[in-house]
From Swiss-Prot:
Protein name: Biotin carboxyl carrier protein of acetyl-CoA carboxylase
Key words, A-Z: Biotin, Fatty acid biosynthesis, Fatty acid metabolism, Lipid biosynthesis, Lipid metabolism
Gene: accB
Origin: domain of life: Bacteria
Annotated Biotinyl-binding domain residues: 104-180
Gene Ontology, cellular component aspect: acetyl-CoA carboxylase complex
InterPro entries: ACC_Biotin_Carrier, AcCoA_biotinCC, Biotin_BS, Biotin_lipoyl, Single_hybrid_motif
Annotated spans, Disordered: 70-95
Pathway: Lipid metabolism; fatty acid biosynthesis
Modified residues (N6-biotinyllysine): K146
GO biological process, one term: fatty acid biosynthetic process
Organism, scientific name: Nostoc sp. (strain PCC 7120 / SAG 25.82 / UTEX 2576)
Presence of keyword Cell cycle: no
Subunit composition and interactions: Homodimer.
């Protein structure tokens, strides 16, 4: 029995509000896997295997098994502080250019999805480390629900570091790259 859009949306909302890092739904006709980025080491710990109806509610078929994994609490790297977690963003609580210190800004993911450095496989990447970029320039793509969303730089400057590998899943507001503003 295929899921409709509202059932998938309800499932994604439920997952986003928990510490579940990965969910896989399987039936005869399809398989759906949802993963969240879970920190520096990207390890997950299995927690529960239960029928789907016990996790989400009565809107989904109960014959589909669900496997859930808890996301570990991210621990800071030795010698670093969590100050970047409390940095002020340039547009309130919206993702975008986050000033991580007086010299660097971060481009953050505005959504959960998959990070891509190029517009298509085999094509040139949008930016490389060391490139000079301008405000509004496309720096990457985040694929979310089969839609390609171009992510633009909120500041002009030089790309100092790209924090995510091509094809990796990203979380909402996850830093993607660091820029030294002009």
């Amino acid at each position: 029995m295929p899921l409709d859009f509202n059932e998938i949306r309800q499932l994604l909302t439920t997952i986003a509000q928990t510490d579940i890092a990965e969910v896989t739904l399987k039936s005869d006709d399809f398989e759906l896997t949802v993963r969240k980025a879970v920190g520096v080491n990207n390890s997950v710990v299995p927690v529960v295997t239960a029928p789907l109806s016990g996790v989400v509610g009565s809107g989904l078929p109960s014959a589909i098994p669900i496997v859930a994994h808890a996301a570990p609490s991210p621990s800071p790297e030795p010698g670093t502080s969590r100050a970047a977690d409390h940095a002020v963003t340039s547009s309130g609580s919206q993702p975008g250019a986050k000033i991580i210190d007086q010299k660097l800004a971060e481009v953050a993911s505005p959504m959960v999805g998959t990070f891509y450095r190029a517009p298509a496989p085999g094509e040139a990447v949008f930016v490389e480390v060391g490139d000079r970029i301008r405000q509004g320039q496309t720096v990457c793509i985040i694929e979310a629900m089969k839609l390609m969303n171009e992510i633009e730089a909120d500041v002009s400057g030089q790309v100092i570091e790209i924090l995510v590998q091509n094809g990796e899943p990203v979380e909402y507001n996850q830093p993607l790259m660091r820029i030294k503003p002009d």
